Amino acid sequence: MAAPSEVAAAVLGEGDGGGFGSWLDGRLEALGVDQAVYRAYILGVLQEEEEEEKLDALQGILSAFLEEDSLLDICKEIVERWSETRDVTTKVKKEDEVQAITTLIEKQAQIVVKPRVVSEEEKQRKAALLAQYADVTDEEDEADEKADPGASTANIGSDKSLFRNTNVEDVLNARKLERDSLRDESQRKKEQDKLQREKDKLAKQERKEKEKKRTQRGERKR
C-alpha cells in the first residue's frame, strides 16, 4: 500500500504540472488570494486535519479575503476537489501496486534454474576415477572367476556396486577428515594466538612495573 506522503504528492501532481496543486493555484489566483503565501497553509489543512475540521480551518484562513455568503461554498469546493482527486489517485496507486506484484510473480515463475556447469577438470577427474574402478573390479572379477566361476557370475553386479559405494564412502571420509584437521589446526592457532597475547600483555605489565620501580629509586636518591 502506498504511503500517505506518496499519495499526497500524487494528488498534488508534483512533477507532472497537473493535479490538485495546479487547480488550487488557479482557484486562489481567481479569488485574489496570494497563492505563494496561502497555498501551503491550505494544503497543510487538507493533508493533516480531520475531515470534519477541514471546513472550519479553511474558513479561518480564507475569511480575510472572501465574503461571508460565499466563504462556506468555496471552502466546500476546495475540500470536495481534494477528496475526489485523492480517491482517484489512491485507486490508481493500488492498481499500479497490484500490477507490479503480478508482474513480479510472472517473472519469478519464468525463472529457470540453470544446470551446474561441469568444468573440463572435473570431467577428467571423474573419468580417471571411473577408469580406476573399472581396472580394480576387472582384476577382482578375474580372480573370482578362477576360484569359483559360478559364484562370480552370480555376484558380479553386487560386487561392483559394493566396491563403488565403498570407494565413494572412502573419498567422503577422507574429505571429512581433511576438514576436521583444518578445523583443529585453526582452533590450535587461535589458542596459540590467545596465549601469545596474554604473554605480551604480562611482559608489557612487567616492563611498566620495572620502569616504575626505577623511577621511584631515582626519586629516593635525589
UniProtKB/Swiss-Prot annotation:
Residues 119-148, 175-217 form a coiled coil. Residues 152-168 have a biased composition (Polar residues). Keywords: Coiled coil, Isopeptide bond, Phosphoprotein, Ubl conjugation. The keyword tRNA-binding does not apply. Residues 136-145 have a biased composition (Acidic residues). The keyword Magnesium does not apply. There is a cross-link at K93 (Glycyl lysine isopeptide (Lys-Gly) (interchain with G-Cter in SUMO1)). Residues 210-222 have a biased composition (Basic residues). Transmembrane segments: none annotated. Residues 172-209 have a biased composition (Basic and acidic residues). The modification Phosphothreonine is found at T137. InterPro entries: CCDC43. Residues 135-222 are annotated as: Disordered. Belongs to the CCDC43 family. This is Coiled-coil domain-containing protein 43. It comes from Rattus norvegicus. The gene is Ccdc43.
